[in-house]
């Protein structure tokens, strides 16, 4: 999480986390391998009683801690040998029984939905309070669809929204709490389902470094294009033929027209371009309604923007932030729950607002592939790079991850933000560095934890009724 308020929420239990397979107990009880700073923690309750909890560690290596010395442990865990297997960056939960019960989560904590996806990736509800009988809730806890088609999720969302309107619901809460992202086409498609006549604007830049400049030249050739077409692991923004302007009206005539560089805050960056070409990316299996000749969902807008609110607990990243920002650009209001116990604004989106994440594995793979193409082309007598340029490429390019003297993350658990995302009104400041407070903030209550649906009632009362937000928290949002 990128901001302190969301990190604070991440410490505590979240019933919504279970829908995406995340740990429901909060990082305070399981810090995923990070030392919390103390051998024990003391919690004091409001009635004055105290409880001390000891910090314990668990081992995620396949063979456990069956090592005779520190050297043997180092050889197994740190050295790049084929016989040993590195720990998974997303390990299973701690082995053994903790001296406490892990909080429940997922469907068992929520009321029965009106309609839901078979794996609960989408759930729809109605509020039953008399004053809120016109409010529907669309819960989207994840876009990470392992083994599921994006169409199946989008179809359930459409069915619920159309049924809600048929049943007289005029207001909609979109609950994105604990949504850490996933399939990006799905996020774009959901936006178009809600606003079918609104175009999607996305703007990104990548750093125009010398190495990226050479890689782009390699991948933009016929040899590079052929390699990309035959390798489905290459998902590159470095092929100028695939890039389009943010409004999708123009393409780039050459690599140089995409690469730039443009100097921004002393850094060389590329020209603005869309996340990708929606027309070519929209398919029957993973559609973006209105693009690529595919229509999905209602042809007219079902809910007015002023009657829609986005709700999060700040734990929203990747595709979640993209969907939320697109909705905000249409005038949809937002509410956030939790954070530190002080009267102040809180950001709606606490996760990454970058344009594209590249793992170290991805970076290594792309560099390796560019190196192969460039070297083979020179060897075949049809060089892409001059002799000096190829020598410079080989000088700049790091070795494969397996070529480092100690093991470097080889499972995609580490990486960097490769592309920055920008707002249409500010093409120079990355969104990652833009403070965007929610329109309203509420603190969690004990009832919200025990009965999560009560948070929807509180959100509806604050945004559609006369209930108050946390003092000093409203009126600080950035107008779309």
From Swiss-Prot:
Chain spans, region Peptidase S41 domain: 134-336
Coiled-coil parts of chain: none
One Gene Ontology molecular-function label: serine-type peptidase activity
Associated pathway: Mycotoxin biosynthesis
UniProt GO BP: proteolysis
Protease is among the record's keywords: yes
The EC number(s) this enzyme carries: 3.4.-.-
Keywords recorded for this protein, A-Z: Hydrolase, Protease, Serine protease
Keyword RNA-binding: no
Region (Disordered): 78-97
Chain segments annotated as transmembrane: none
Mutant lacking the gene: phenotype: Impairs the production of ustiloxin B and its intermediate ustiloxin F.
Similarity remark: Belongs to the peptidase S41A family.
Function: Peptidase S41 family protein; part of the gene cluster that mediates the biosynthesis of the secondary metabolite ustiloxin B, an antimitotic tetrapeptide. First, ustA is processed by the subtilisin-like endoprotease Kex2 that is outside the ustiloxin B gene cluster, at the C-terminal side of Arg-Lys, after transfer to Golgi apparatus through the endoplasmic reticulum (ER). Cleavage by KEX2 generates 16 peptides YAIG-I to YAIG-XVI.
Name of this chain's protein: Peptidase S41 family protein ustP
Organism for this UniProt entry: Aspergillus flavus (strain ATCC 200026 / FGSC A1120 / IAM 13836 / NRRL 3357 / JCM 12722 / SRRC 167)
Chain's gene name: ustP
């Amino acid at each position: 999480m990128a901001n302190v308020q969301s990190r604070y929420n991440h410490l505590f239990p979240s019933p919504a986390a279970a829908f995406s397979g995340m740990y429901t107990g909060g990082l305070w009880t399981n810090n995923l391998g990070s030392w919390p700073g103390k051998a024990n923690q003391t919690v004091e309750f409001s009635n004055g009683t105290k409880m001390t909890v000891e910090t314990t560690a668990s081992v995620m290596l396949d063979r456990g801690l069956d090592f005779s010395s520190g050297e043997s442990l180092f050889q197994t865990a740190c050295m790049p040998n084929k016989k040993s297997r590195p720990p998974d960056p997303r390990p299973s939960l701690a082995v053994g029984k903790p001296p406490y019960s892990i909080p429940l989560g997922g469907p068992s904590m929520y009321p029965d939905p009106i309609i839901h996806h078979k794996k609960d990736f989408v759930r729809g509800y109605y509020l039953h309070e008399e004053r809120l009988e016109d409010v529907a809730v669309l819960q989207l806890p994840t876009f990470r669809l392992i083994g599921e088609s994006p169409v199946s999720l989008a179809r359930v969302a459409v069915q619920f929204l159309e049924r809600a309107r048929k049943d007289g619901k005029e207001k909609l809460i979109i609950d994105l709490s604990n949504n850490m992202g996933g399939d990006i086409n799905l996020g774009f498609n959901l936006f178009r389902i809600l606003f079918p006549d609104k175009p999607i604007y996305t703007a990104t830049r990548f750093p125009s470094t010398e190495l990226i400049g050479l890689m782009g030249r390699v991948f933009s050739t016929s040899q590079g294009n052929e390699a990309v077409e035959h390798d489905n692991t290459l998902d590159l923004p470095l092929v100028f033929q695939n890039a389009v302007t943010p409004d999708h009206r123009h393409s780039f005539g050459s690599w140089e027209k995409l690469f730039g560089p443009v100097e921004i805050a002393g850094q060389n960056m590329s020209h603005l371009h869309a996340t990708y070409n929606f027309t070519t990316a929209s398919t029957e299996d993973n559609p973006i309604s209105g693009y690529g000749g595919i229509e999905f969902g209602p042809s007219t807008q079902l809910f007015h923007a002023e009657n829609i609110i986005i709700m999060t607990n700040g734990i929203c990243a990747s595709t979640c932030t993209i969907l939320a920002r697109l909705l905000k650009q249409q005038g949809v209001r937002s509410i956030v729950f939790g954070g530190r116990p002080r009267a102040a604004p809180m950001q709606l989106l606490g996760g990454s607002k970058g344009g594209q994440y590249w793992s170290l594995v991805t970076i290594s793979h792309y560099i390796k592939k560019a190196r192969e193409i460039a070297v083979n082309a020179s060897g075949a007598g049809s060089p892409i790079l001059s002799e000096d340029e190829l020598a410079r490429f080989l000088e700049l390019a790091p070795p494969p991850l397996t070529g480092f003297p100690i093991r470097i993350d080889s499972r995609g658990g580490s990486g960097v933000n490769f592309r920055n995302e920008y707002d249409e009104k500010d093409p120079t400041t990355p969104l990652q560095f833009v403070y965007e407070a929610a329109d309203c903030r509420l603190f969690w209550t004990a009832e919200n934890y025990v009965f999560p649906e009560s948070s929807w009632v509180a959100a509806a009362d604050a945004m559609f009724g006369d209930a108050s937000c946390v003092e000093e928290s409203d009126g600080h949002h950035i107008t779309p």
